[in-house]
């Protein structure tokens, strides 16, 4: 904006592009857009530019609700694998970009599915299948959020023995008390 002598704000889908503090007058309030911090554990930081419009939500997030009655796996493209183990009746609500495909499968067949369809049916990807890391949470009885840094989160409700999450090696996962 400074180079073209304009005071109009521009937007970018690329994270971390705000270079200076920008004051924005909105009705009777003054808002400040400030440079942010780049988080290396955010998958958004490691997504190729051509995938950003697929990963970043363009509309308000709409929850995608699944009722699960047996051990199941939720695959978010080839970016995230969520294994729900030892569940009888569990609700899984996904809050991610509408452009990322969510695939539900039986957990005992998840390994075979990922080996056979990774980077094809399970896409997009940002790392090889061998470059995945594992996060675990044991004993869920109630509501729990599984946050995938930079992408969104799953809200798990019910009782299950274990949650196992696989993400690319640069990503991170946080388990927290459900916020919704």
Would you name each region that the model predicts?
Residues 2-180:
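Helix-rich effector regions associated with P-loop NTPase G domains
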């Amino acid at each position: 904006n400074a180079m073209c002598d304009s005071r109009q704000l521009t937007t970018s889908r690329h994270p971390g592009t705000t270079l200076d503090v920008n004051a924005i007058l909105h009705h009777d309030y003054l808002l400040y857009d400030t440079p942010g911090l780049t988080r290396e554990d955010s998958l958004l930081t490691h997504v190729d530019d051509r995938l950003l419009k697929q990963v970043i939500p363009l509309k308000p997030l709409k929850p995608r609700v699944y009722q699960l009655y047996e051990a199941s796996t939720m695959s978010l493209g080839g970016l995230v694998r969520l294994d729900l183990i030892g569940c009888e009746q569990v609700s899984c609500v996904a809050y991610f970009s509408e452009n990322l495909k969510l695939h539900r499968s039986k957990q005992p067949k998840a390994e075979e599915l990922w080996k056979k369809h990774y980077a094809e049916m399970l896409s997009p990807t940002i790392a090889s299948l061998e470059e995945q890391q594992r996060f675990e949470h044991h004993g869920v009885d109630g509501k729990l959020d599984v946050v995938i840094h930079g992408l969104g989160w799953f809200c798990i409700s019910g009782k299950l023995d274990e949650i196992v999450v696989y993400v690319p090696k640069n990503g991170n996962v946080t388990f927290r008390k459900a916020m919704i």
